Amino acid sequence: MTGFTPDAPVLHEIKNHGEELTKAEAGVAAFAAKRNNRWYPKFHIASNGGWINDPNGLCFYKGRWHVFYQLHPYGTQWGPMHWGHVSSADMVNWKREPIMFAPSLEEEKDGVFSGSAVIGDDGKLKFYYTGHRWANGHDNTGGDWQVQMLAEPNNDELTSATKRGMVIDCPTDKVNHHYRDPKVWKTGDKWYMTFGVSSAEKRGQMWLFSSDDMVKWTYEQVLFEHPDPDVFMLECPDFFPIKDVEGNEKWVIGFSAMGAKASGFMNRNVSNAGYMIGTWTPGEAFQPETEFRLWDCGHNYYAPQSFNDGERQIVYGWMSPFVEPIPMQDDGWCGNLTLPREITLGADGDLHTAPVAEMDGLRENTTDFGAISLGVNGEQTIADDAEAVEIEMTIDLNASTAERAGLKIHATEDGAYTYVAFDDQIGRVVIDRQAAAQGDRGYRTAPLSAEELASGELKLRVFVDRGCVEVYVNDGRQAMSSFSYASEGPRAIKLVAESGTLKVKSLVLHHMKSIGLE
């Protein structure tokens, strides 16, 4: 295919970008002034007000970590997308930066959609993102019209940028509207870009482009097509090399699949983010060697984006509310990101994701409970009021007989709680929200391998924030992210055993300090 990659960027300014950014800042500030903090995160990244979704433009640049994110500054529901921005010198203490992008060009007049950041050969950063327009000019009933855009920062602090314009147009006869979320990297002496596409046949694909100068791009081929015909779009694609413990290189392809049907424990969310591990050689398509696996098994995880800081592959995900009711929308804000996770390729041949080491810097006021034993249907309160904590716990599976055992978090006087438990009957870790007083309910499970079950030991690392929980199983072999809307009053944490006994080898509770964005 040719004819849709211009020799130079194309742009048509229709609004003053500076004025639009000023309006957006005022929109966020209006929500922030009235925000209810009952579920607003203490140590997760969120906007000061308004709606957020996908993490964007993740990078480590000139000594600072930068996290951008999709932002609707004028509502707590999804709307015209902007780019919000926070930065940090240590991944522990964060500061708010000016909003980076607002719609101001004809090519993006209905939204500055998701994209990524990459450092070029000259050491300078470039942003690639999707410009979004409604095909009928006013709403989503006629589908999308999307193109890929380039922007360059005006300073090393990344507090403003100059939009260069469209670098890849959309061949509308080959695409069923969805055409977005560019990811750029370099292999050898050539730059590559991939993004998600819904083909004319409504198949979820990732297309591959190449460039010598990061401006003029050439279509190469379909990098990957999802084998499931129900999957019509692969959002927020990711693609990166990773080495195992022996130094052997594999390639990871990640995407958020739209259209997959639920089956058993798999694909229970509206859309599901996952990956495959395989091989790739420039000039060829990606060759998967594994099945599709979820990045995260919780209720509320989507649109992850990873980046390499020179030593580690780090990923942030968006905690997506997915389905109503969404009570935080009444509080002047909606949505937050997960903790940053380091991706490694384990000896078991699978990806592990665990919080980056810097997260230990959030701990304060630690209590070590040592070993704990509970009798049949036993219960022990380990915190009377835990607003923001991390719990490290190791369960002795061989010495426990409980059918389910674990932690009731956000346990309030009205009887509401969220349950993080090991379920012995199904051999899985569970986040169960059946007792939640607000928000969506249901439960999600993370699998344990036969090897893990046979080990007789289960390690859980549980991060509880004001309105969400993240669970890391056995040093990150599985991860789970779910919203948990606590009721009014003290929020206790209780260790419980159901229909049997529980033996905990160790339990440590850390109260967590703020990351500075409240």
Regions found by a protein language model. Name each.
Residues 2-181, 186-234, 243-297, 312, ...:
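Beta-rich carbohydrate-recognition and catalytic domains
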Residues 3-5, 25-31, 246, 279-518:
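Beta-rich accessory regions
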